[in-house]
Amino acid sequence: MMRKKEKVITMTVTLILVVILICIKVTHFVIIERPLKQCRIVSAYHLTVDTNGAQIDQSWLFEKDDLTYIDIAKTFEQTYFVTDYAGGSGDSGALNELTIAFGETMDGMPDIRITVSENGYIQINGKRACPLSLKYAGNRLYGHLLECLQDGADRQQ
């Protein structure tokens, strides 16, 4: 009798854990992955800053209606991990950053803004993203973002 009761408790706990894991996966997909993939990219620019954080150059890659996921994915692929140090006397050079803004709120601000520096430093902020600043494994983030962007490109065709 006691063994049967233990078995029922074990099965119940296992079932509850499985349901929780499924809920977490569904929530992750619905809240995090899907909205990002379905967001329209509203702006992207390539920024070069010196080691003190001063802006050297900023070139807009795309703005508003001219954006396509294919173009931004190609540009991201070409500009990220490119060592393009601006020569400076006695200076260690400059870092390239690529900023991509997804979506747009009523006040014209992007829902999510992701800035990737060539040294692997990532900043994510915006109304639909928790403010986040981290040193990330650059290749993994680059791959994940490119997949999201290419997935959006497939939907646009």
What would you call each of these model-derived segments?
Residues 2-157:
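Function-determining sites in protein domains
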